[in-house]
Amino acid sequence: KTKTFARISLFLAGLYLCVGWVQLQRAENMTAFLAQTRGHVIETSIVKPTLANLILWRSIYEMNGKFYVDAIRVGFFSEPKVYEGETIEKFIPGIHAPKLPEKSVLADDIERFTHFSAGYIGIQPERPHLLIDVRYSNLPTSTDPLWAIVIDLHRPDQHAQYQLFRDASHEIRQKFLAFLLGEHIN
């Protein structure tokens, strides 16, 4: 009885991974198609599943110092659907922090955050003191961060502060569910 349960569990786990791989390929293909329709050439890209499902994916690609963030819904029995998202400028130390000493506490913190964010660091003009991990957000089309570091370029000897921005409000949950179900979003 235990062996049968273990075999069934192993089969289901393998099936889930295979379905996940197929869905990832579909989402990546849609990302490439979307960039092509925009006349963009992808420099780097990443496609990640959203919370606890294999249907709704967050697509991010880079071109000319900007990240383009979109949601891609790849239903099991439907055509893929794209929800166009936001764009955010990539943080480039030589451009956004040219006077920051290379051998400073803050420069080390920025380098560490960049490493652990796989280089997907964004900066918003209205909040230039925040470095955002673009890979994660409450909504798959948004550049509003789940977390970021707060930097003060006038104090390079001070550590950056880690800040969370989680939002589980009813409005966010409803919008996420609408994306997941493939509904029209205003």
Give the positions of each predicted feature.
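Internal/C-terminal transmembrane anchor helices
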Residues: 2-27
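Generic signal for short, ordered secondary-structure residues
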Residues: 10-14, 38, 95
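Alpha-helical transmembrane signal-anchor/signal-peptide segments
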Residues: 24-43
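Extracytosolic and intramembrane catalytic regions of membrane-associated proteins
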Residues: 43-44, 54-186
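A short beta-turn/loop motif at secondary-structure boundaries
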Residues: 49-53
